[in-house]
Amino acid sequence: MALFFKCNPIDLDNEQVTDYLHHLKSRHSTPSDSFFKHTVYGLRYACKVCGIKELEVVLPSIERPKKLPVVLSREEIQLLLKTPKLLKHRVMLGLLYGCGLRCGEVRNLQLKDLDFDRKMLHIRQGKGRKDRYVPLGDMLIRGLKKYLDAERPITWCFNGNDKEGKAVALSPRGVQWVVKQARQRSGIKKEVTTHVLRHTYATHLLEMGLDIMTLKDLLGHVDIQTTLVYLHVSRLDKQQAFSPLDRLYTK
């Protein structure tokens, strides 16, 4: 593989490994699942021996089961948003749900990205290196203004601290901790992660009447197929399912 890419083995990244496996698949007519499994096992062992971070590889010949995203109800969202004691954490949760942001997008959010006059949020170079704008609701704007007046951040909206106590962008673990703590204290039984809040944002917008193409742009998806999964979990009027037993004895 290193010879194929003409580089040092320890410099290989996930994308190169996946590309190489797809290359092997295209060369061989019927590669077995076990062939790719053992290829990946070998890669993982090599990573362990070399002391480098284990590569995350998608096996091209093995179809993963397609799971529908977890979606919270509106009542669960209301409960989650009012649970944190700190305003900073409530605002962070509000952005994850109210703007459909990814974890990294919340971390990298800067003061210059907030446009309160136009009620827009500028997401710079998110996943896929593509900027986008998402609407900022009045409730979020009020919360952000109150938080900014109290905390006075300089660059990033949400600061963390390095070992010397200097302000840096909040770590991924810091964002995830806020979500985890809110879930535990709220008593919600469903899985709640930053991405579950993003799924919930998308699903609720569809249920409120937003069209699928606009949702695609708000989420920053390149392929519409990625967005279409939310149609399967949305309770749209024309798609609301019911049990025939409920109507068997009704006139």
Per-range role (PLM):
Residues 1-251:
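Conserved catalytic core of the tyrosine transesterase superfamily
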